[in-house]
Amino acid sequence: MTTNNSNDNNKRYGIIKQQLQQQQQQHHQQHEQHSRLVEMTAGCGAGFMASLFTTPLDVIKTTLQVDNSSNKTIMSTVKSILDRKGGVKNLYLGLKPTLVGQIPSWAVYFSTYTFCKELFTKENDKHSLLEKESPLIFMTSAIIAGAATSICTSPIWLIKTRFITQEMVGRQKKYRGIVHSMVSIYHEEGFRGLYKGLGPSLLGVLHVGVQFPLYEKFKSILKEKNKNKELGIVEIMIASSVSKIIASVVAYPHEVLRARSQDSSPDSPNRTYRGNIIQMFKQIVREEGWRGLYRGMGVNLLRVTPSCVITFTSYEYIKKFLSQNQNHF
């Protein structure tokens, strides 16, 4: 009798234990799903805020990048943009595709980056291959996230570039909207035409491969100096701006290569660029010198630094708000 009672108790204990494990697993899965949703929502909000504030500087930068005349300055470029029909509105050319591209870009980027970082950290903790919070983990996660984002959103950035450059003097204005642009490019240049500039974009993952490890490192340093207290807005601004400036200077030439490649439509002066990225690189250096690879970098730094500060600050605070109020959603 005692043996039967003991067996029954063991069975009940086993069932209860199994139920608890299932509940824990279910809770863990729900937590992970919520975390992914928080990352994506925070990324969307950050992209939206950055786009609204920095589109005019993006228009100036793109115009400088695709114009290979040697006498162009930031001020003369701004004047030529404002002198065209439309005036100040010209500074917001490409805002629609920018919003359409930026919002999913940051949603994909931040969620992929966080997922990869957590995955690699777990594997590293199991096998102790690298030190904790290794820069290699941050770099690899950033590169994978950057590549995924570039592949997903490349056609949108192509359309944004065409929207901006078709307004330049002597260009034919033929794109009326995002859908019309996509259909027109597909008919004239084929499916591959929608992915012009993807090669330089993938080369540009070097940018995030430098930026995100630096951002994480600066945050870690500032947190130590702050005695491990939560970072405030000033610390986030410092970490994001310094890491962005360094990464932008290191990886800038890919931006010029991408813009020239995306602008190589049939009626563009940049249609003369043929071949792969290396041949385009050599042609620019031969015809314009090394400075040609850094066209628009000054205005780019004026654009990306505040853009990065807005993006990362918005991201961190939206993420914090959603995490603290997860029971209300």
Curated annotation (Swiss-Prot):
Disulfide bonds: none annotated. Keywords: Membrane, Mitochondrion, Mitochondrion inner membrane, Repeat, Transmembrane, Transmembrane helix, Transport. SUPFAM superfamilies: Mitochondrial carrier (SSF103506). Residues 1-39, 112-135, 215-230, 316-329 are mitochondrial intermembrane. PROSITE patterns: SOLCAR (PS50920). It comes from the Eukaryota. GO terms for molecular function: NAD transmembrane transporter activity. It is a multi-pass membrane protein. One of its GO terms (cellular component) is mitochondrial inner membrane. The keyword Membrane applies. GO terms for biological process: NAD transmembrane transport. The chain crosses the membrane at residues 40-60, 91-111, 136-156, 194-214, 231-251, 297-315. Belongs to the mitochondrial carrier (TC 2.A.29) family. Mitochondrial solute carriers shuttle metabolites, nucleotides, and cofactors through the mitochondrial inner membrane. This is Mitochondrial substrate carrier family protein W.
